[in-house]
Swiss-Prot record:
Alphabetical keyword list: ATP-binding, Kinase, Nucleotide biosynthesis, Nucleotide-binding, Transferase
Summary of the function given for this chain in its UniProt record: Phosphorylation of dTMP to form dTDP in both de novo and salvage pathways of dTTP synthesis.
Protein name: Thymidylate kinase
Domain of life from the UniProt record: Bacteria
GO molecular function: ATP binding; dTMP kinase activity
GO cellular-component term (any): cytosol
Enzyme type, top EC level: transferase
Originating species: Halothermothrix orenii (strain H 168 / OCM 544 / DSM 9562)
E.C. numbers: 2.7.4.9
GO terms classed as biological process: dTDP biosynthetic process; dTTP biosynthetic process; dUDP biosynthetic process
Family matches, as CDD domains: TMPK
Length: 207
């Protein structure tokens, strides 16, 4: 029996990593066979790609960035996600295909159809069952995200202009019109957000 594939999406600093950790611990405590992963960087190859993508010293073209994310995702699906789902595990992923549509498609202005087509080929039918989008004001999210870095400047993407991140946020609003998505107000306490996510996920697991 196939497992359950859940992804968390959102702009920088929206709290995805915090929420996915909280959900992972709660589901483990409930006795579910669950794994947690992220993009980029969910595999050994992905970790190397992540370094290239997020290093603020790297000047990278939009197409090169897009293809590196696609390569990371291709390896991620084959090496980790598909095998885990086929063995019945619950897979929690911090970012997946929708990040490329939002960031490289809408954010960078690449052809949306190309971004979707390449990524649909890459994931080979491995679609998330449920995607949570943590929605937050861009300025507030960037302030949070940059505050986590040693120099308070953030990684290569976090240093992008506010207008870039506004396009990304708007993209998530458009994507969230699909029934697979649940958009949540991320400007609340982590406990309140967690309760809402956990309730939705538990409902899927006990069907």
């Amino acid at each position: 029996m196939r497992g359950l594939f859940i992804t968390l999406e959102g702009i920088e600093g929206s709290g995805k990593s915090t929420q996915i950790e909280m959900l992972y611990k709660r589901l483990k405590k409930d006795g579910f066979d669950v794994i947690i992963t992220r993009e980029p960087g969910g595999t050994p190859i992905g970790k190397e790609i992540r370094k290239l993508l997020l290093d603020p010293d790297n000047i990278m073209g939009a197409k090169a960035e897009f293809l590196l994310y696609a390569a990371d995702r291709a390896q991620h699906v084959v090496e980790l996600i598909k095998p885990a789902l086929e063995s019945g595990k619950v897979v929690l992923a911090d970012r997946f295909i929708d990040s490329s549509i939002a960031y490289q498609g809408y954010g960078r202005g690449l052809d949306i159809d190309v971004v979707k087509t390449v990524n649909e080929w890459v994931i080979d039918g491995c679609w998330p069952d449920l995607t949570f989008v943590l929605d937050l004001d861009v300025e507030k999210g960037l302030e949070r995200a940059r505050g986590y870095s040693p120099d308070n400047q953030g990684d290569r993407l976090e240093r992008e202009l506010v207008t870039f991140h506004r396009r990304v946020r708007q993209a998530y609003h458009q994507l969230a019109e699909d029934r697979r998505f649940i958009m949540l107000d991320a400007d609340r306490s982590r406990e309140e957000i967690h309760r809402e996510i956990y309730h939705k996920v538990k409902g899927c697991l006990i069907k």
